[in-house]
Protein backbone atom coordinates (compact mmCIF):
# COMPACT_ATOMS: atom_id res chain seq x y z
CA UNK A 1 0.00 0.00 0.00
CA UNK A 2 1.45 3.38 -0.95
CA UNK A 3 1.23 6.50 1.19
CA UNK A 4 -1.81 7.91 -0.60
CA UNK A 5 -3.77 4.67 -0.31
CA UNK A 6 -3.29 4.29 3.43
CA UNK A 7 -5.11 7.56 4.14
CA UNK A 8 -8.82 6.89 3.92
CA UNK A 9 -10.89 9.33 5.98
CA UNK A 10 -11.18 12.74 7.58
CA UNK A 11 -10.72 12.96 11.35
CA UNK A 12 -10.80 16.09 13.47
CA UNK A 13 -7.41 16.70 15.05
CA UNK A 14 -8.12 20.02 16.82
CA UNK A 15 -11.26 21.82 17.83
CA UNK A 16 -13.00 24.32 20.05
CA UNK A 17 -16.54 25.62 20.51
CA UNK A 18 -16.93 29.30 19.57
CA UNK A 19 -19.55 31.16 21.58
CA UNK A 20 -20.54 34.72 22.42
CA UNK A 21 -17.38 36.62 23.31
CA UNK A 22 -17.25 38.74 26.46
CA UNK A 23 -18.93 42.10 26.04
CA UNK A 24 -16.08 44.58 26.22
CA UNK A 25 -16.16 48.28 25.41
CA UNK A 26 -14.46 47.46 22.12
CA UNK A 27 -16.03 44.59 20.20
CA UNK A 28 -14.59 45.36 16.76
CA UNK A 29 -11.15 44.93 15.26
CA UNK A 30 -9.57 45.94 11.96
CA UNK A 31 -6.26 45.05 10.32
CA UNK A 32 -5.88 42.27 12.87
CA UNK A 33 -3.63 39.22 12.54
CA UNK A 34 -4.31 36.10 14.62
CA UNK A 35 -1.82 33.24 14.76
CA UNK A 36 -2.61 29.92 16.42
CA UNK A 37 0.00 27.15 16.82
CA UNK A 38 -1.57 23.68 16.65
CA UNK A 39 -0.14 20.25 17.53
CA UNK A 40 -0.80 17.59 14.88
CA UNK A 41 -1.72 14.22 16.36
CA UNK A 42 -1.98 12.02 13.23
CA UNK A 43 -0.07 11.31 10.07
CA UNK A 44 -1.90 12.58 7.01
CA UNK A 45 -1.59 14.25 3.64
CA UNK A 46 -4.43 16.78 3.56
CA UNK A 47 -5.87 19.25 6.02
CA UNK A 48 -8.99 21.42 6.08
CA UNK A 49 -10.35 24.14 8.33
CA UNK A 50 -13.77 24.99 9.76
CA UNK A 51 -14.48 28.65 10.52
CA UNK A 52 -17.51 29.69 12.55
CA UNK A 53 -19.45 32.88 13.08
CA UNK A 54 -22.11 30.93 14.96
CA UNK A 55 -22.81 33.65 17.53
CA UNK A 56 -21.98 36.63 15.33
CA UNK A 57 -24.51 39.38 14.78
CA UNK A 58 -22.83 40.62 11.62
CA UNK A 59 -21.06 38.97 8.71
CA UNK A 60 -17.29 38.72 9.04
CA UNK A 61 -14.71 38.66 6.28
CA UNK A 62 -11.59 36.54 6.57
CA UNK A 63 -9.32 38.54 4.28
CA UNK A 64 -6.61 35.88 4.24
CA UNK A 65 -5.78 32.65 6.03
CA UNK A 66 -2.67 30.50 5.78
CA UNK A 67 -1.11 27.43 7.31
CA UNK A 68 2.55 26.51 7.60
CA UNK A 69 4.95 24.37 9.60
CA UNK A 70 5.72 26.08 12.88
CA UNK A 71 9.28 26.87 13.92
CA UNK A 72 8.16 28.06 17.34
CA UNK A 73 5.02 29.61 18.79
CA UNK A 74 5.31 32.87 16.82
CA UNK A 75 7.27 31.75 13.76
CA UNK A 76 6.52 29.72 10.65
CA UNK A 77 8.83 28.17 8.07
CA UNK A 78 8.10 30.61 5.24
CA UNK A 79 8.84 28.00 2.58
CA UNK A 80 5.92 25.89 3.84
CA UNK A 81 3.23 28.58 4.03
CA UNK A 82 0.12 27.70 2.02
CA UNK A 83 -3.03 29.68 1.40
CA UNK A 84 -6.25 28.39 2.91
CA UNK A 85 -8.84 28.87 0.18
CA UNK A 86 -12.62 28.71 -0.05
CA UNK A 87 -13.97 27.58 -3.39
CA UNK A 88 -10.64 28.68 -4.84
CA UNK A 89 -10.84 32.17 -3.29
CA UNK A 90 -8.32 33.45 -0.77
CA UNK A 91 -10.95 35.32 1.25
CA UNK A 92 -14.40 34.41 2.49
CA UNK A 93 -17.41 36.05 4.10
CA UNK A 94 -19.04 34.11 6.93
CA UNK A 95 -22.61 35.19 7.57
CA UNK A 96 -23.96 35.63 11.11
CA UNK A 97 -24.82 32.21 12.49
CA UNK A 98 -22.89 30.58 9.67
CA UNK A 99 -19.94 28.27 9.25
CA UNK A 100 -17.63 27.54 6.33
CA UNK A 101 -15.23 24.72 5.54
CA UNK A 102 -12.10 25.49 3.56
CA UNK A 103 -10.84 23.72 0.49
CA UNK A 104 -8.50 20.83 1.17
CA UNK A 105 -4.86 21.84 1.57
CA UNK A 106 -2.32 19.26 0.41
CA UNK A 107 0.22 18.97 3.19
CA UNK A 108 2.33 16.04 4.34
CA UNK A 109 1.97 15.89 8.12
CA UNK A 110 3.31 13.58 10.80
CA UNK A 111 2.19 12.93 14.34
CA UNK A 112 3.91 15.44 16.62
CA UNK A 113 4.31 18.14 13.97
CA UNK A 114 3.31 21.67 14.86
CA UNK A 115 1.61 23.95 12.38
CA UNK A 116 0.57 27.57 12.67
CA UNK A 117 -2.74 28.86 11.37
CA UNK A 118 -2.74 32.57 10.60
CA UNK A 119 -5.94 34.55 10.07
CA UNK A 120 -5.99 38.12 8.78
CA UNK A 121 -9.04 40.32 9.35
CA UNK A 122 -8.51 43.34 7.13
CA UNK A 123 -11.92 44.98 7.53
CA UNK A 124 -13.87 46.05 10.59
CA UNK A 125 -14.85 42.78 12.22
CA UNK A 126 -17.26 42.13 15.07
CA UNK A 127 -15.30 39.85 17.41
CA UNK A 128 -18.33 38.02 18.72
CA UNK A 129 -17.59 34.38 17.94
CA UNK A 130 -14.76 33.02 20.01
CA UNK A 131 -13.83 31.03 23.08
CA UNK A 132 -11.46 31.51 26.00
CA UNK A 133 -9.44 28.38 26.80
CA UNK A 134 -6.24 27.56 28.64
CA UNK A 135 -3.63 24.82 28.63
CA UNK A 136 -0.11 24.05 27.42
CA UNK A 137 -1.37 23.43 23.86
CA UNK A 138 -3.78 26.36 23.79
CA UNK A 139 -2.13 29.66 23.09
CA UNK A 140 -2.40 32.21 20.37
CA UNK A 141 -0.97 35.56 19.32
CA UNK A 142 -2.30 38.73 17.77
CA UNK A 143 -0.71 41.69 16.05
CA UNK A 144 -1.99 44.52 13.90
CA UNK A 145 -1.07 44.23 10.24
CA UNK A 146 -1.14 41.46 7.66
CA UNK A 147 1.42 38.80 8.59
CA UNK A 148 -0.43 35.93 6.96
CA UNK A 149 2.52 35.19 4.67
CA UNK A 150 5.29 36.33 7.00
CA UNK A 151 7.71 34.07 8.81
CA UNK A 152 7.52 35.83 12.16
CA UNK A 153 5.25 38.14 14.09
CA UNK A 154 7.01 41.32 15.26
CA UNK A 155 8.15 40.86 18.84
CA UNK A 156 7.48 44.40 20.02
CA UNK A 157 3.94 44.62 18.65
CA UNK A 158 2.63 41.11 19.32
CA UNK A 159 0.67 39.93 22.32
CA UNK A 160 -0.30 36.47 23.45
CA UNK A 161 -3.95 35.53 23.88
CA UNK A 162 -6.05 32.63 25.07
CA UNK A 163 -8.97 33.80 22.96
CA UNK A 164 -9.58 31.68 19.88
CA UNK A 165 -11.70 33.55 17.35
CA UNK A 166 -13.60 32.02 14.43
CA UNK A 167 -11.38 28.92 14.03
CA UNK A 168 -13.66 26.04 15.00
CA UNK A 169 -12.14 22.72 13.91
CA UNK A 170 -9.22 21.33 11.93
CA UNK A 171 -9.56 17.99 10.12
CA UNK A 172 -6.78 15.84 8.71
CA UNK A 173 -7.06 13.15 6.04
CA UNK A 174 -5.57 10.17 7.78
CA UNK A 175 -5.62 6.43 8.44
CA UNK A 176 -8.77 4.45 9.16
CA UNK A 177 -7.59 3.46 12.65
CA UNK A 178 -7.65 7.04 13.90
CA UNK A 179 -10.58 8.65 15.69
CA UNK A 180 -11.54 11.71 17.70
CA UNK A 181 -12.52 11.93 21.37
CA UNK A 182 -14.79 14.90 22.15
CA UNK A 183 -14.44 16.60 25.54
CA UNK A 184 -17.69 18.49 26.13
CA UNK A 185 -18.49 20.86 28.97
CA UNK A 186 -18.15 24.23 30.62
CA UNK A 187 -15.33 26.18 32.29
CA UNK A 188 -13.89 23.01 33.82
CA UNK A 189 -13.22 21.68 30.33
CA UNK A 190 -12.23 25.14 29.05
CA UNK A 191 -9.29 24.86 31.45
CA UNK A 192 -6.27 22.71 30.85
CA UNK A 193 -7.25 19.06 31.41
CA UNK A 194 -8.05 18.32 27.72
CA UNK A 195 -4.58 19.55 26.75
CA UNK A 196 -2.96 17.34 29.38
CA UNK A 197 -5.07 14.41 28.20
CA UNK A 198 -3.76 15.01 24.68
CA UNK A 199 -0.18 15.17 25.95
CA UNK A 200 -0.70 12.02 28.02
CA UNK A 201 -1.98 10.06 25.02
CA UNK A 202 1.02 11.26 23.02
CA UNK A 203 3.57 10.41 25.70
CA UNK A 204 2.02 7.00 26.43
CA UNK A 205 1.94 5.98 22.79
CA UNK A 206 -1.80 6.13 22.16
CA UNK A 207 -1.35 7.33 18.62
CA UNK A 208 -4.84 6.77 17.20
CA UNK A 209 -6.86 9.36 19.14
CA UNK A 210 -7.25 13.13 19.04
CA UNK A 211 -8.83 15.26 21.76
CA UNK A 212 -11.43 17.75 20.54
CA UNK A 213 -12.44 20.34 23.12
CA UNK A 214 -16.01 21.65 23.08
CA UNK A 215 -16.15 23.84 26.18
CA UNK A 216 -17.95 27.10 26.91
CA UNK A 217 -17.52 28.63 30.36
CA UNK A 218 -20.71 29.29 32.30
CA UNK A 219 -23.00 27.11 30.21
CA UNK A 220 -25.76 25.00 31.68
CA UNK A 221 -27.61 21.92 30.48
CA UNK A 222 -31.17 23.08 31.00
CA UNK A 223 -31.16 26.88 30.86
CA UNK A 224 -29.42 29.88 29.34
CA UNK A 225 -29.35 33.58 30.10
CA UNK A 226 -31.16 36.14 27.96
CA UNK A 227 -29.42 39.19 29.45
CA UNK A 228 -26.29 40.91 28.15
CA UNK A 229 -24.62 40.57 31.57
CA UNK A 230 -24.27 36.81 31.15
CA UNK A 231 -24.53 36.53 27.38
CA UNK A 232 -21.01 35.11 27.16
CA UNK A 233 -22.15 32.10 29.19
CA UNK A 234 -23.59 30.86 25.94
CA UNK A 235 -26.34 28.54 24.83
CA UNK A 236 -27.87 25.74 26.86
CA UNK A 237 -27.01 22.14 26.17
CA UNK A 238 -30.09 21.50 24.07
CA UNK A 239 -28.80 24.02 21.52
CA UNK A 240 -25.11 23.11 21.80
CA UNK A 241 -24.70 19.39 21.99
CA UNK A 242 -25.87 18.16 18.60
CA UNK A 243 -23.88 20.82 16.76
CA UNK A 244 -20.72 20.47 18.82
CA UNK A 245 -20.59 16.69 18.54
CA UNK A 246 -20.81 16.83 14.75
CA UNK A 247 -17.12 15.98 14.52
CA UNK A 248 -15.37 14.10 11.71
CA UNK A 249 -14.18 10.68 12.84
CA UNK A 250 -15.54 10.99 16.38
CA UNK A 251 -15.85 7.74 18.31
CA UNK A 252 -16.63 8.88 21.85
CA UNK A 253 -17.55 11.86 24.00
CA UNK A 254 -16.66 12.73 27.59
CA UNK A 255 -19.43 14.84 29.14
CA UNK A 256 -18.38 17.02 32.08
CA UNK A 257 -21.34 19.35 32.40
CA UNK A 258 -24.09 20.34 34.80
CA UNK A 259 -22.44 21.99 37.79
CA UNK A 260 -23.55 25.46 36.68
CA UNK A 261 -27.20 24.38 36.68
CA UNK A 262 -26.75 23.79 40.41
CA UNK A 263 -24.47 26.63 41.53
CA UNK A 264 -25.73 29.58 39.48
CA UNK A 265 -29.14 30.17 41.12
CA UNK A 266 -28.83 32.41 44.20
CA UNK A 267 -32.20 34.16 44.42
CA UNK A 268 -33.43 37.40 42.90
CA UNK A 269 -32.71 39.28 46.12
CA UNK A 270 -29.03 38.55 45.50
CA UNK A 271 -28.94 38.63 41.68
CA UNK A 272 -31.97 39.51 39.58
CA UNK A 273 -30.73 37.30 36.76
CA UNK A 274 -30.29 34.18 38.92
CA UNK A 275 -33.63 33.26 40.51
CA UNK A 276 -33.93 30.17 42.67
CA UNK A 277 -36.64 28.98 40.29
CA UNK A 278 -33.77 28.10 37.92
CA UNK A 279 -32.50 25.45 40.33
CA UNK A 280 -33.29 22.02 38.84
CA UNK A 281 -34.31 18.90 40.71
CA UNK A 282 -32.15 15.79 40.59
CA UNK A 283 -34.64 14.24 38.18
CA UNK A 284 -34.48 17.32 35.95
CA UNK A 285 -30.72 16.84 35.70
CA UNK A 286 -30.95 13.11 35.04
CA UNK A 287 -33.58 13.64 32.35
CA UNK A 288 -31.55 16.43 30.78
CA UNK A 289 -28.39 14.35 30.51
CA UNK A 290 -30.30 11.33 29.24
CA UNK A 291 -32.62 13.05 26.78
CA UNK A 292 -30.36 15.82 25.49
CA UNK A 293 -26.92 14.22 25.59
CA UNK A 294 -26.92 10.43 25.81
CA UNK A 295 -29.63 9.78 23.23
CA UNK A 296 -28.10 12.25 20.77
CA UNK A 297 -24.60 10.80 21.21
CA UNK A 298 -25.74 7.22 20.78
CA UNK A 299 -27.73 8.13 17.68
CA UNK A 300 -24.40 9.28 16.24
CA UNK A 301 -22.69 6.05 17.25
CA UNK A 302 -20.63 7.71 19.99
CA UNK A 303 -19.59 6.00 23.19
CA UNK A 304 -20.54 8.16 26.17
CA UNK A 305 -18.37 8.74 29.25
CA UNK A 306 -19.85 10.93 31.98
CA UNK A 307 -17.65 12.90 34.33
CA UNK A 308 -18.69 13.15 37.98
CA UNK A 309 -19.79 16.59 39.12
CA UNK A 310 -17.12 18.13 41.34
CA UNK A 311 -17.75 18.49 45.10
CA UNK A 312 -19.65 21.63 46.12
CA UNK A 313 -20.28 21.13 49.84
CA UNK A 314 -20.48 24.54 51.45
CA UNK A 315 -21.56 26.25 48.23
CA UNK A 316 -24.47 28.67 48.58
CA UNK A 317 -26.97 26.29 46.93
CA UNK A 318 -25.64 23.04 48.41
CA UNK A 319 -28.65 22.43 50.70
CA UNK A 320 -31.29 24.23 48.61
Please report, for each region that a protein language model flagged, where it lies by residue.
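Alpha-helical cap/lid subdomain in secreted, periplasmic
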Residues: 227-320
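Small-side-chain structural scaffolding
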Residues: 43-44, 65-68, 183, 194, ...
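Generic signal for short, ordered secondary-structure residues
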Residues: 28, 149, 223-224, 275-276
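N-terminal secretory targeting modules
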Residues: 1-184, 189-190, 203-206, 318
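Conserved residues at the C-terminal ends of beta-strands
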Residues: 52, 68, 217, 256, ...
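Conserved, compact domain cores that house catalytic/ligand-binding motifs in diverse enzymes
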Residues: 161-254, 258-264
